[in-house]
Amino acid sequence: MLAFTLRRAIQAIGVMIAVGIIAFSMFRFAGDPVNQMVSIDTPYAERAAIRQSLGLNDPIPVQFVRYFANAVQFNFGISYQFRQPVASLLKERMPATLELAIVATIFAMVFGILMGVYSALHEDSLLAKLFQAVSLIGISLPTFLIGILLIYLFAVILGWLPSFGRGQVVKLGWWTTGLLTVSGLKALIMPSITLGLFQMTLIMRLVRAEMLEVLRTDYIRFARARGLTTRAIHFGHALRNTLVPVITVAGLQFGSVIAFAIITETVFQWPGMGLLFVQAVQNVDIPIMAAYLLMVSLIFVTINFVVDILYTIVDPRLRSTISRPA
């Protein structure tokens, strides 16, 4: 188990180094960073001084080592657009994105599992067919269109929910949350549904397929022959084994939720890291773009690492395979 953990950790470090190279290359391919920081009338001498202060005259390997060393300390440089440290901008926007992603994931997990279990246990019921239709809609419609439809229905026509923003938030140290205010909760409903709908349909379909497969296995037949109750068979045995692959998918999808929150945050003008990234792209703000790439990659790598470890703990077969000598 220890060797497996170390091997996964080394692979994670290798991935982050590769991503660091890509992020560093963005500065080279997007033109001279000095041109993004100064006006067109800036004298050449001042430009040269800025280049020297930024270390842009050093050899490229030296610049990369310095950039990666600073990135490890979460020092991503100064934003061209905001003239502020990128780390402070990300720190300011991160609570909004994480709060949205966590609520969307909880929504997707709870409703996805419930709908998937019901669809598997009552295949021919009208409600199960309705769930299947909803899953097709959730997978087929693009995220931005779902968001626009929700805004039109609940904000424009009914006027129940706000169409943009985060509402009133409460500061808890450096963290800000809208979960403690009514306006914050109302502002969170539509973005979380928009972001979590695709994940919900994916989890629902996975749970349904796994549940149907597990219910056909021999040990379920044996459990019925022993006289166990239907409730014990369905929820004590079948569902528990069904949730093993769901852990992997849900963990990986959480990273996707954070990465693809860009669209949802843009539609609802949600003040998170995704909206900050869109603004950076519009203004060619390379430090923010590179930092966002590194942060999202770090989240993906960390989630993958944790899911791999949890998977070996939950699944005894995989644990025995890892422990077996080569």
Feature annotation, model-predicted:
Residues A12, R93, T97, A133-S140, ...:
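Residue-level signal for discrete positions within transmembrane alpha-helices
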Residues L2-F4, M94-L127, G173-A326:
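Alpha-helical transmembrane segments of integral membrane proteins
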Residues A18, I22, M26, F111, ...:
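Alpha-helical membrane-inserting segments
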Residues L6-M16:
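N-terminal signal-anchor/signal peptide hydrophobic helix marking the start
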Residues A9, I50, I60-F76, V86, ...:
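Hydrophobic alpha-helical segments of integral membrane proteins
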